[in-house]
Amino acid sequence: MLVSLLGILLSVIVGFVVTLISTKWVIGLCKKRGFTGKDINKLTKDDVPVLGGIGIVAGFVAGSFTFLLTSYNLSPGIENVVVSILLSSLIIGFLGLLDDIFNISQATRAFLPIFASIPLILYSVGHTIISIPFLGKVNFGILFYIIILPATLTITANAFNMLEGLNGLGAGMGLIMALALAYIGLKSGGTSFYAGIVSIILASVLFGFLIFNFYPAKTFPGNIGTYFIGSVIGSIGISGYMYTALFFLYLPYVIEFVLKAKTRFKGVSFGKIDDQGYLHWDSKPNSLTHIVMRIGKFKEYHIVLIIWGIEILFAILAVVFQTVTITI
């Protein structure tokens, strides 16, 4: 057990350190190659590197691989969880990078996470029997792998990409989600426990990335980062049988989806900045960020902290309902 705990600790440290090193390197590379975007929520509209998500991918892969190496012979069945999530994350990371570089159309981009579901299907992660409130347990059989699993991963990845645009918002939301899933998983056994460990690694990586991404951001995650985080969160939830938790954790994104759908997904999440640095939105809200802007006078980091607070409340509900009340 001691060796296993040391392996977990080493994996978390490796993930965190590699994220710091690789993100700093990517920032320099993006500045040299011109991979930057305007920070439109600032008065100065500075150019900010947009491929910071590469650091997230590198840190997560390094941390997960370290955990796999240090725990493979000690934990039967760990390969299915870690390897499937690792392969899935590499696929979505690569596709996200292509999107950032070549600007893939929105319609095509929406279906990219389906490819990331292939390793999860091949390793048969998840459980075909799902407990549904008021209906009881339902065995979806093969439909789980050909419909439910790919659909879940597609939804979690695309939804996560919708609510972004403010410094640190997405990475912080991902950190909260990862900590909630880690708590649930580590309280459980078997596959859920392994998924919880992977979630701890993701949390350490996102914490490291936030050092560069929180206000004022030195880099943006890009589509590679947002799709990656959403996809990994979905993979962890699926492999750890934490479907109820995923439902509650993604409720803010359900709100975001409804608001964006009203604009036919052409809406934005950023606001209009005044000369004092406060963000405003006077039109009909097409993002959760706009709702916050309309209820008070806030600067960018205030809005981020408020939405983080909302996500923390849903994370608490996720933990309670997943571990105490029901299991979907």
Swiss-Prot record:
The keyword Ribonucleoprotein appears for this protein: no
One GO location term (cellular component): plasma membrane
EC number: 2.7.8.15
Biological-process GO terms, alphabetical: cell wall macromolecule biosynthetic process; cell wall organization
Transmembrane spans: 1-21, 48-68, 78-98, 107-127, 129-149, 166-186, 192-212, 228-248, 301-321
Entry-linked InterPro entries: Glycosyl_transferase_4
Disulfide bonds: none
Subcellular localization: Cell membrane
Regulation of its activity: Inhibited by tunicamycin.
Protein family per UniProt: Belongs to the glycosyltransferase 4 family.
PANTHER family according to UniProt: PHOSPHO-N-ACETYLMURAMOYL-PENTAPEPTIDE-TRANSFERASE (PTHR22926), UNDECAPRENYL-PHOSPHATE ALPHA-N-ACETYLGLUCOSAMINYL 1-PHOSPHATE TRANSFERASE (PTHR22926:SF3)
Name of the protein described by the UniProt record: Putative UDP-N-acetylglucosamine--dolichyl-phosphate N-acetylglucosaminephosphotransferase
Species: Sulfolobus acidocaldarius (strain ATCC 33909 / DSM 639 / JCM 8929 / NBRC 15157 / NCIMB 11770)
Gene designation: gnpTA
